[in-house]
Amino acid sequence: MKLDAPFNLDPNVKVRTRFAPSPTGYLHVGGARTALYSWLYAKHNNGEFVLRIEDTDLERSTPEATAAIIEGMEWLNLPWEHGPYYQTKRFDRYNQVIDEMIEQGLAYRCYCTKEHLEELRHTQEQNKEKPRYDRHCLHDHNHSPDEPHVVRFKNPTEGSVVFDDAVRGRIEISNSELDDLIIRRTDGSPTYNFCVVVDDWDMGITHVVRGEDHINNTPRQINILKAIGAPIPTYAHVSMINGDDGQKLSKRHGAVSVMQYRDDGYLPEALINYLVRLGWGHGDQEIFSREEMINYFELDHVSKSASAFNTEKLQWLNQHYIRELPPEYVAKHLEWHYKDQSIDTSNGPALTDIVSMLAERCKTLKEMASSSRYFFEEFETFDEAAAKKHFKGNAAEALAKVKEKLTALSSWNLHSIHEAIEQTAAELEVGMGKVGMPLRVAVTGSGQSPSMDVTLVGIGRDRVLVRIQRAIDFIHAQNA
């Protein structure tokens, strides 16, 4: 049987991996980790990475899901050398191989009705036998190929399938446990397990990194590969990701979609760093640059045990990257969140300044955008608890005094603003907090912000003075 090689593959590449999601939903964190491990292994070995969309499930696959998967891969910055390839565009190739297999006696047409198969299964269950096809049609030549039928792979009946999993070690499955797998449906469409085999062959895949839920497919796929004379890739089945309660990760544990983490304010570097450590390690190191991941990653260091997703750890990593990455880079991601929250940033400080001001305070970019709205827009009301706590006593007098000094400043900068607040406190013979806290509530609407000099510079003189007067009027109205 001949290899179909339309992909312009470099024959000198020794390692070629793939990520092959089904477009029936978003890119979830488990799939993203599998893609990351596959990508890292290729990069570590100077190999190539293939993106393949396994869209043979015509009822459940959608263009929207495909777009979401590609968007997630691009956001995570996991570029591919080949693809995306779509299985639905390769049906002719799959059917060509199936027809050749029938000719060579490696597969056969099965005309059994649904009723016959159900009766067979019922009988086997009654006899406490393993449900499997009885090869009724293997030697039945009384039907025309034009009659409705499926095509089954003629699986070996003796011996075992043995493979050395790069994560789990040697795995052996007796062929007596395997059925004659359907490789083409009645409607003429090839099945998932068969398409995967032909694709891995044609695309020169040397290493298959995928979830442990695919282990049962592997012996079936290996037998087909052997039958058609194709090389057998190395398989690596990675463990599942659980929630912190030990149950399989699902929506009830929080976000599971990669793009939901983007929406929630996480940087791709944080999610990548978190996912790589979720089942793999290099000593006690927690924080890895992309280059370090590529240099250190090996499949035999991937854990066999399930990993527990810990959102607090992810938040810690996210805050680290918000602090440590260049403000210009973080600002590009922050800009998306301002747009998402309908905050117009055209009249206010540079976003790089926002990042510098709030990097130590915010765990997510979503929080950074929402908590800095006052730099760009007017707020409607003062935070009730903050106003009750700080708009009392001599707060109005302190605000009037500091407004007077701020108005008189010839230069609006950190030093001059700090001096104005300090002088106001000295003249009123009160602590800095008695001036600073009412001022903070007055100009931000809340009791939390960066230092007052930084905050006032960011808001701008005109807005600051208007807001202070608004707060004074509010206090007088409350006391009237």
Curated annotation (Swiss-Prot):
Pfam families: Anticodon_2, tRNA-synt_1c
BP GO annotations: glutamyl-tRNA aminoacylation
Compartments in which it is found: Cytoplasm
Residue interval(s) of motif 'HIGH' region: 21-31
Positions of disulphide bridges: none
Domain of life: Bacteria
Cofactor: binding comment: Binds 1 zinc ion per subunit.
Broad class of the protein's primary localization: cytoplasm
Broad enzyme group: ligase
GO molecular function: ATP binding; glutamate-tRNA ligase activity; tRNA binding; zinc ion binding
Binding site for Zn(2+): C110, C112, C137, H139
Record: residues binding ATP: K251
Record's GO cellular component terms: cytosol
Keywords for the protein's UniProt record, in alphabetical order: Aminoacyl-tRNA synthetase, ATP-binding, Cytoplasm, Ligase, Metal-binding, Nucleotide-binding, Protein biosynthesis, Zinc
EC annotation from Swiss-Prot or TrEMBL: 6.1.1.17
Known function: Catalyzes the attachment of glutamate to tRNA(Glu) in a two-step reaction: glutamate is first activated by ATP to form Glu-AMP and then transferred to the acceptor end of tRNA(Glu).
Family the entry assigns: Belongs to the class-I aminoacyl-tRNA synthetase family. Glutamate--tRNA ligase type 1 subfamily.
NCBIfam families: gltX_bact
Protein name, as recorded: Glutamate--tRNA ligase
Taxonomic lineage of the native organism: Bacteria, Pseudomonadati, Pseudomonadota, Gammaproteobacteria, Pasteurellales
